């Protein structure tokens, strides 16, 4: 809590550390998802400062999300904008354009085999997780997720399963790590995509498995 309000005091006016579209989207997602914890025991002035900062970040993202680099940074920016638009009073008009932009990014960045241009399995997992959050937030708000988002999740899930070793960790290619423990299982369960085997190569990678031994 102290770190959050220190950041608001130092950088909450839209300048300084953290004011890029991807980081702002990431911050909005975390602040909103952990709002009950962050606001616990705060006084009225602190609570108002928190919501003012959230609103300022939404306005910033509305203008600046197109400047985020294509791929994970842009998905972070748009997912944060959608989450904030759904959660904050008076921000509903921003949801539709953000959802449409997210659908366009899904169609452009996620190929027919469920891969992304960087071919980084851990980055693929991060994008997949953001899309599951966006889909869940829209569904819980009574909105129908765009078909492009749903289809992207359906393409990505088999690819992620194919890129996972028997110990649960992702193959480490193109700068990616094994992924946070339990993140892949949680994201797959949340997406609700029926388990299927990836047809052919998974993002250009082949998988062999026997018992507890895997080769990717």
Region locations from a protein language model:
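Aromatic-lined, polymer-binding surfaces characteristic
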Residues: 1-153
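Carbohydrate-active enzyme catalytic cores, enriched for enzymes
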Residues: 111-216
């Amino acid at each position: 809590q102290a770190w959050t309000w220190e950041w608001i005091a130092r950088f909450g006016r839209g300048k300084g550390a953290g004011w890029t579209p991807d980081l702002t989207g990431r911050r909005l997602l975390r602040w909103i998802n952990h709002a009950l914890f962050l606001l616990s025991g705060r006084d009225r002035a602190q609570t108002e400062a928190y919501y003012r900062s959230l609103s300022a970040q939404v306005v910033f993202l509305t203008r600046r999300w197109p400047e985020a680099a294509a791929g994970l940074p842009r998905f972070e920016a748009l997912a944060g904008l959608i989450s904030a638009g759904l959660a904050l009073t008076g921000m509903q008009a921003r949801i539709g354009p953000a959802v449409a932009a997210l659908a366009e990014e899904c169609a452009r960045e996620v190929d027919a085999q469920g891969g992304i241009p960087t071919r980084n399995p851990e980055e693929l997992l991060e994008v997949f997780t953001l899309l599951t959050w966006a889909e869940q937030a829209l569904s819980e708000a009574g909105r129908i997720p765009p078909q492009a988002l749903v289809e992207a999740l359906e393409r990505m899930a088999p690819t992620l399963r194919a890129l996972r070793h028997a110990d649960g960790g992702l193959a480490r290619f193109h700068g990616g790590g094994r992924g946070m423990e339990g993140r892949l299982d949680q994201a797959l369960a949340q997406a609700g995509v029926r388990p299927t085997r990836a047809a052919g190569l998974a993002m250009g990678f082949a998988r062999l498995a026997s018992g507890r031994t895997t080769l990717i």
